[in-house]
Amino acid sequence: MPTVALFKQDGNQNGEVQLNEAIFGIEPNNNVVFDAVIMQRASLRQGTHAVKNRSAVRGGGKKPWRQKGTGRARQGSIRSPQWVGGGTVFGPTPRSYSYKLPRKVRRLAIKSVLSQKVADESLVVVDALNFDAPKTKAFAEVLSNLNVNSKVLVVLEDDNTTAALAARNLKNVTVIPAKGLNVLDVINNDKLVITQGALSQVEEVLA
């Protein structure tokens, strides 16, 4: 069973914490992680691209000239696709790019990236992150005490709004609740700082 040090806010070690091996001690599956990242990035696409087809372009309701007798090619509308200013054929329309992987696959992906963080010694567990007021300076001091000076993902308990407000203005710091833990945020940050309460919530969901 994986074991990591448990720290206090002042940076001093406060014992150790045992991690669930089924979540933090598996062999990472890179293929599944890749699929999960592609899924998340697809859901971030706006999908608002659009063109005007011949029914949406302004004008063109009148036949430009009679069908026969002019010597010219027959035309039904000046907004047909072959005309300058005409509608576009088979152009992009607004759509949603989001899709879902099976739940087991999504869970295997998050377990894989968490296990990789433990293997890389990039997981920092803190007993709690409690602040009297949402002060950015106070949160920055905590990160300094924990010797975290790179891009970091901070995972908090779902109801710890004070700490979330204190950290939201810090550069290279991403704060999410335990229920929002996802593959893309974990791999986009060098360090993962998680409170003991949030760790329990994550293990409860993924176990």
From Swiss-Prot:
Signal peptide (residue range): none
Cellular component annotations (GO), alphabetically ordered: ribonucleoprotein complex; ribosome
Record-level GO BP terms: translation
Keyword tags: Ribonucleoprotein, Ribosomal protein, RNA-binding, rRNA-binding
Pfam families: Ribosomal_L4
Subunit structure and binding partners: Part of the 50S ribosomal subunit.
Protein known as: Large ribosomal subunit protein uL4
Organism from which the protein derives: Ligilactobacillus salivarius (strain UCC118) (Lactobacillus salivarius)
